Amino acid sequence: MINKLAILGLMIIGISCESREEITRQQYVVEGMNLYQTNCANCHQVDGSGLKDLYPPLARTDLWQRVKMSELACIIKHGQKDSIQVNGKPYNAYMPANPKLQALDIAELMTYMREKWSPNKTIFSLDSARYALKNCP
C-alpha cells in the first residue's frame, strides 16, 4: 500500500513539474495527430511522405523553413488552388479547403506537424491560429 502511494506521489510531482505550456503542447500534439490522420493522411500519408507527384511531402522538406506558419494555417483552412514548390519540385494538385476546422483544430494540427517534421518543435498557439486565420488572404 505504501509503495502504491509513493508511486502515485512521484507521478503527481512529475506531472506538476511540467509547465502549463508544455502540458498544453503535449495535448495539442495528441489531438493534432488525430486531426492529421482524419484530414491529411490520405493525401500526405501517415508518415508525411506525400503521394508521388500529386501531393507534396511534409516530412524532410524545406517547407518548414520557407513558408510562414500563418500561411500554412490559411492553406489548411482554405485550401490551395495554386502550385506549391516543395524541395524545388512543383506540386499542382488542388488541396481542398477544410471549413469545419476551427482555430483550435488548426493550432493542434500545426503543433503536431511541427513536432513531427519541423525543426521548430514549439506550440502553434490558439492565439497564433486565430490571428493567422483572421488575416488570411
Feature map (PLM): residue ranges:
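Axial heme c-ligation environment in periplasmic c-type cytochrome domains
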Residues: 53-59, 81-134
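Solvent-exposed helix-loop boundary motif
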Residues: 72-81
